Amino acid sequence: MAEAAPETPPENESPQREPWEEWVEDVMEEIKQEALRHFDPRLLTALGNFIYSRHGDTLAGAGELIKILQRALFLHFRAGCQHSRIGQPGGGNPLSAIPPS
């Protein structure tokens, strides 16, 4: 019986993924800029200080802040943000391409 060739892992030919910390920093910057367009900077500073007091300068704290800001922005848009084009005259409905069922 012939000896089986040793198993080797497949070559990873996909591009190198961005390190997790850099990704979190990028997301934080994007969501911060969006939040500053819609909320009072003093509120955002207070929220950042609160998260920092609970988590310090950690990835868990950054994740918590991202989660809270995403929810706040979602609710803000859902309530009818003046700056949002979604649901506004001339803004177009992004779901209009989907035929009604």
UniProtKB/Swiss-Prot annotation:
Name of protein: Protein Vpr
Assembly: Interacts with human UNG.
InterPro entries reported in the protein's UniProt record: RetroV_VpR/X (IPR000012)
Protein's UniProt keywords contain Transcription regulation: yes
UniProt modified residues of type Phosphoserine: S84
Domain of life: Viruses
Protein's GO biological process: symbiont entry into host cell; symbiont-mediated arrest of host cell cycle during G2/M transition; viral penetration into host nucleus
GO terms under cellular component: host cell; host cell nucleus; virion component
Function: Stimulates gene expression driven by the HIV-2 LTR. Prevents infected cells from undergoing mitosis and proliferating, by inducing arrest or delay in the G2 phase of the cell cycle. Cell cycle arrest creates a favorable environment for maximizing viral expression and production.
Subcellular location: Virion; Host nucleus
Segments of this protein annotated with the region Disordered: 1-21
Alphabetized UniProt keyword annotations: Activator, AIDS, Cell cycle, Host G2/M cell cycle arrest by virus, Host nucleus, Host-virus interaction, Modulation of host cell cycle by virus, Phosphoprotein, Transcription, Transcription regulation, Viral penetration into host nucleus, Virion, Virus entry into host cell
Pfam family, one: VPR
